[in-house]
Amino acid sequence: MDGIRRILVAVKEPAAKTLPAVRKAAELAKAFGAELVLFQSIALPLYLEGNVSYMNGGLADAERCTRDACERSLEAIACKLRRKGIEVCVSTQFDYPIYEAVIREATRLKVDLIVAEQHHGHHAASLLHLVDWELLRLSPIPVLLVKDPRAYRRPKVLAAVDPDHTYAKPVWLDREILNAGQEIARALHGSLHAVHAYVPIPALAFPTGAISEEDVETIHTRCREKANKKLKRALRDAEIRSSVAHVIGRHPADAIAEVASQIHSSLVVMGAISRSGFKRLLIGNTAERVLDRLSCDVLVIKPAHLVKKVPQKRRGAAHARLRLHPLIV
């Protein structure tokens, strides 16, 4: 991320009492002096009565009425934000699935950041909702997933880096993560923390009696020192001068969640790569474990050239004909 000039926020329900994603996006837009786009994808099918003809304008009228209603709802939100000095525009599109629609509109408008509210109601509480997961997986643009409705108050931003470049992550991805974390922390008058997780060598890796407990402890100490040096080098390469470093000898999912909880982080910035097949299963499982265990917001940054491209053409409105039958008593 090289500055934030335009932010798209995916609005789920404009009439909702609280709009956490809009609130957070507005905070960032104000802090960065960025333009804010309120976007709603109309993904539900239009139901037409049985006597409405597709040929006599009934379909076009239904689409226009639906779209006008959505735009009025978004404009009501936009008016309040404009009074706070934020530049806001609204956009609605008949398109689906929702995650593809958001990515298409964000790409068309050349935004620098997508903000989306976490979906709830999944049948398994331990699994990330499909819409959220696919948006994070497919978007070439950084995505901020809002999980905590509370406003940012001098937030502690935690940047999760991987100097070991596990799973062939690009070398520059850590720099992007750290720079994004620093930009946001600075803009919101917060502080930056960085965490690097390394997997310590288990004692069971050595044959019984082949090595003393003191030697095992020495090996663990060296592993930690090596990991600490790598993190400091990553911070130096990214020209990060003010941050708090955390080096944890645990699985990344556990380490990130642990540090985020300890420091009461408001936002975790992490990287991810998209893969297919078995690699996707392995990498996705790690990423999903991290995302599910965090109660704070998460900003996911990915190498755009490694992301599967979403088709540019919109799918348009979905239609269904509603047949009205006479009531027989």
At which residue positions do the language-model features occur?
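Structural beta-alpha unit
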Residues: 1-3, 17, 64, 76-114, ...
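Small/aliphatic-rich secondary-structure junction motif
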Residues: 2-58, 156-213, 217, 236, ...
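General small-molecule cofactor/ligand-binding pocket signal
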Residues: 37-39, 89-93, 144, 193-195, ...
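A short acidic, glycine-rich active-site loop
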Residues: 57-72, 214-229
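Short beta-strand elements of ligand-binding domains
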Residues: 115-118, 142-148, 298-302
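Glycine-rich, Arg-bearing micro-motifs that act as flexible, cationic patches
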Residues: 116-134, 267-293
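Short, structured interface segments
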Residues: 130-151
